[in-house]
């Protein structure tokens, strides 16, 4: 049920643990900013059985913000892949290729407001972060928090439903061609900026509903 808490990359004590479920792989290497994007023996995952692959690295080997990918070998070929359970992916502004990103800020976000109270009859404002701004650009979590949330509260809504939050490479898909089911779309900002948006909404008495897409993917 909580596979996202096991697979992907996680900081466990003084170590980093990388895990993937890839039953058809013959070998998997982790490569990224921390090893010059090279396929090297020290970054080869261990086959733990049952399709589970794992690599444990010391905490000093990886830092917050590092980009990385898997390099997977299988019978008849090999290639780069993003972790199935990546929680943060970013797009290169030049090549437009996505990489996973280690996301572990030194300080966790500190919530300021309690959750908005449950209401029997929610009045829902449906919105898309990127298209909610008035400027001819993709709006961000910060833009939405500053400019849109106050308007939603003033109009009397008690719930906001946010569309297209999962990472998707094609912006024109409106978020319905999901590539990374466990990652917020980085084009809108950071996870902490999204938490600040939710926090501010709760402070205004507005509940937040995340429109999570399970039935569409890029494959």
Give the role of each language-model region.
Residues 28-30, 68:
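Short beta-strand elements bearing conserved aromatic residues within extracellular beta-rich modules
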Residues 31-33, 73:
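Predominantly extracellular/luminal cell-surface or secreted proteins
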């Amino acid at each position: 049920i909580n596979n996202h808490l096991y697979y992907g990359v996680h900081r466990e004590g003084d170590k980093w643990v990388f895990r993937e479920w890839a039953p058809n792989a013959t070998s998997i290497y982790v490569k990224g900013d921390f090893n010059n994007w090279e396929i090297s023996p020290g970054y080869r995952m261990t086959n733990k059985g049952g399709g589970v692959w794992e690599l444990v690295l010391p905490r000093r080997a990886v830092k917050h913000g590092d980009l990385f990918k898997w390099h997977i070998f299988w019978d008849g070929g090999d290639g780069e892949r993003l972790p199935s359970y990546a929680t943060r992916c970013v797009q290169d502004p030049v090549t437009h290729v996505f990489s996973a990103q280690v996301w572990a800020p030194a300080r966790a976000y500190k919530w300021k407001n309690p959750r908005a109270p449950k209401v029997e009859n929610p009045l829902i404002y449906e919105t898309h972060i990127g298209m909610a701004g008035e400027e001819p650009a993709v709006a961000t979590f910060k833009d939405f928090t500053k400019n849109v949330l106050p308007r939603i509260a003033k109009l009397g809504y008690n719930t906001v439903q946010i569309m297209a939050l999962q990472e998707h490479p094609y912006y024109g898909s409106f978020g319905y061609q999901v590539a990374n089911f466990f990652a917020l779309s980085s084009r809108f900002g950071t996870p902490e900026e999204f938490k600040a948006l939710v926090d501010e909404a709760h402070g205004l008495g507005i509940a937040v509903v995340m429109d999570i897409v399970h039935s569409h993917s890029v494959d």
